[in-house]
């Protein structure tokens, strides 16, 4: 199917579960032309459609590694969180290895959803970096949190 044929089938909003199920039922690679649209739907907070798509992407693994790398590289911590907590845990170790560079970048960039810590955890779990590197970043994050906590305490006075 073409993108033009697939777009009308896409979920209409964040709660259109029937629409999400319909597009997912078409399967991959049929839905490849609207992959970007599906990834964009995953940005919405508290969305059953986003969760359903994230779960489905978990079953696709290596077929969508490049698409997920692009999505993880964006500045949207919501989509990152959904991919790190719903999609990636369904992948095999070999499939997760494809995201090593992207996960390492996320691990060094704190955000509102603590995706950096999630990425560090995945990196450690699948041995994607040297333990020395992980410990160095963990120590750095603790130091920064300590400084932030002191500033927050000053604001509370």
Model-derived features with residue positions:
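Amphipathic alpha-helical scaffolding segments comprising HEAT/armadillo-like alpha-solenoid repeats
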Residues: 1-8, 29-41, 62-72, 93-107, ...
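Eukaryotic acidic, Ser/Thr-rich intrinsically disordered low-complexity regions
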Residues: 2-3, 100-157
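Residue-level detector of solvent-exposed, low-hydrophobicity positions
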Residues: 13, 35, 56, 63, ...
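Short inter-helical turns and helix N-cap capping residues of alpha-solenoid HEAT/ARM repeat scaffolds
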Residues: 45-46, 75-77, 110-112, 145
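Short amphipathic alpha-helical patches
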Residues: 62-65, 76-80, 92-95, 126-130, ...
């Amino acid at each position: 199917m073409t993108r033009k044929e697939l777009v009308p089938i896409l979920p209409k909003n964040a709660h259109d579960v029937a629409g999400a199920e319909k597009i997912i039922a078409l399967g991959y690679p049929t839905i490849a032309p609207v992959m970007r649209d599906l990834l964009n739907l995953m940005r919405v907070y508290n969305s059953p459609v986003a969760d359903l798509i994230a779960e489905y992407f978990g079953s696709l693994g290596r077929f969508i590694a490049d698409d997920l790398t692009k999505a993880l590289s964006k500045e949207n911590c919501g989509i990152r969180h959904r991919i790190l907590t719903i999609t990636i845990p369904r992948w095999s170790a070999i499939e997760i290895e494809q995201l090593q560079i992207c996960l390492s970048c996320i691990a060094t960039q704190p955000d509102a959803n603590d995706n950096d810590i999630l990425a560090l955890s995945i990196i450690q779990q699948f041995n994607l970096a040297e333990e020395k590197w992980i410990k160095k970043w963990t120590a750095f994050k603790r130091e920064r949190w300590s400084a932030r906590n002191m500033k927050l305490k000053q604001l509370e006075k």
